[in-house]
Regions:
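Acidic, gly/ser/pro-rich intrinsically disordered tails
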Residues: 1-2, 18-23, 39-42, 95-97, ...
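Core FKBP-type peptidyl-prolyl cis-trans isomerase
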Residues: 4-47, 83-88, 100
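OB-fold and OB-like beta-barrel modules that bind single-stranded nucleic acids
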Residues: 5-13, 31, 69-81, 106-109
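Small beta-barrel nucleic-acid-binding modules, principally OB-folds
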Residues: 29, 36-73
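Beta-rich strand-turn-strand
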Residues: 56-90, 97-98, 113-115
Length: 139
């Protein structure tokens, strides 16, 4: 059996790298994904889902070096279930409401924010470009 998850979002805080007792690098960071839709009442609903990502080995070192809060990334990997529940990790937020944390072990991390954008704080190119007209698509 095989499963994979692909997300695109923004890094929520600067990555943290550490080493296992055997010397293998592991970097952890959070990624927020956003979705907007209109419900049956005509209200616009904005939904954010947070993922905790772990990258290992050389990829961990590269993520730690180049990612920072706000960087746009694509993460491909596998969901890592909570050992106790077999699903997402459930916890209570500061306001007392139940929250879920989805954890991904990364196989691929792609940086979608260019180095120049990261240094200047400018938005990613796809955030400023006009939407493509379907007639302009070359296939």
């Amino acid at each position: 059996m095989f499963h994979t998850i692909i997300i695109v979002g923004n890094v929520g805080r600067d990555p943290e790298m550490r080493y296992t007792p055997s010397g293998q690098a592991v970097t952890s960071f959070s990624v927020a994904t956003n979705r907007q839709y209109t419900n049956n009442n005509g209200e616009t609903i904005k939904e954010t889902i947070w993922f905790r990502v772990s990258a290992w080995g050389k990829q961990a070192e590269i993520c730690n070096q180049y990612l920072k809060k706000g960087s746009k990334v694509l993460v491909e990997g596998r969901l890592t279930p909570d050992k106790e529940t077999g699903g997402p990790r459930i916890w209570n937020g500061q306001d007392g409401t139940a929250r879920a944390s989805y954890e991904i072990t990364a196989q691929t991390v792609r940086f979608l924010t260019s180095r120049a954008e990261a240094e200047s704080g400018a938005p990613a190119a796809d955030e400023t470009a006009a939407p493509a007209d379907e007639a302009d698509i070359p296939f």
